[in-house]
Amino acid sequence: MQVNEALQATEPMPIQAGKQIASWPHLAGFLAIMGGMVAMGFLAQHGASAGSAAESQLAGHSKAIPIYLVAAFMDWALLYYCWVGVHRNGGTLETLSGGRWLTWKSVGVDLAIAAPFWAAWEGAAYGVHWLLGANSAKTVDSLLPKTLLEVLIWIGVSITAGICEEMAFRGYLQSQFRALGAGVAAAVLAQGIVFGLAHAYQGWKNTVVISVLGVLFGALAAWRKNLRSNIVVHAWADVWGGWLQHLVWR
């Protein structure tokens, strides 16, 4: 059996490339939501810092848990919006995800793909950061978890981001761009740019970095036709970047 055939055998319900999964007005609404997030991100960067934060920080640490909870709520709300549009068009959550794990073989395949992809993903992040140079934007460093409760909530928020953002951007948006007639490369690029812009609160350089990472996620989704490896890598990357790497490298 060829490698591609073996991989396809683990797919219970692959994402159907080029198929419209929600109405065009619904897509316009999604993009309007993204526009609002870009505007809020711009205001966060250029407005006064929240709480007792220094000028170089978006907010003081006392705001960490409330911000975690708001971020999780916004992610689930965005996924719910996508699901409503897909459901009205006759789809399900599997329309967005490409299906869940059904066998241990599929778990092993997806984890085997996720591990090297995460290493390449991290390398790309460091490389783009290096190319862009020093970042003068306000950072979220003061919001990183310190206490056990904050760490546990952070892990929950990371898992939420992995599930919701992958389904929203790679499952919904990338599929809709393909249905508009964009080729695979154009759809992957477009959703990656929108994904980066949704993180505009981190400043323009980080927006560029996140756009590149979003393109990589989109390429993985286009290849695998499901989001299982994407979700694993996304959630793990957030846990690693926001908490675990600071324990390992301190």
PLM region spans:
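N-terminal, membrane-interfacial amphipathic/helix-forming hydrophobic leader that caps
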Residues: 1-104, 126, 131, 242-250
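Residue-level signature of transmembrane alpha-helical entry/exit and packing/kink sites
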Residues: 22-30, 63-71, 106-110, 150-154, ...
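Surface-exposed loop/turn and secondary-structure junction residues enriched for glycine/proline
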Residues: 96-100, 105, 143-146, 230
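Transmembrane helix-loop-helix hairpins at the membrane interface
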Residues: 12-13, 118-126, 130-250
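Interfacial segments of alpha-helical transmembrane regions
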Residues: 98-119
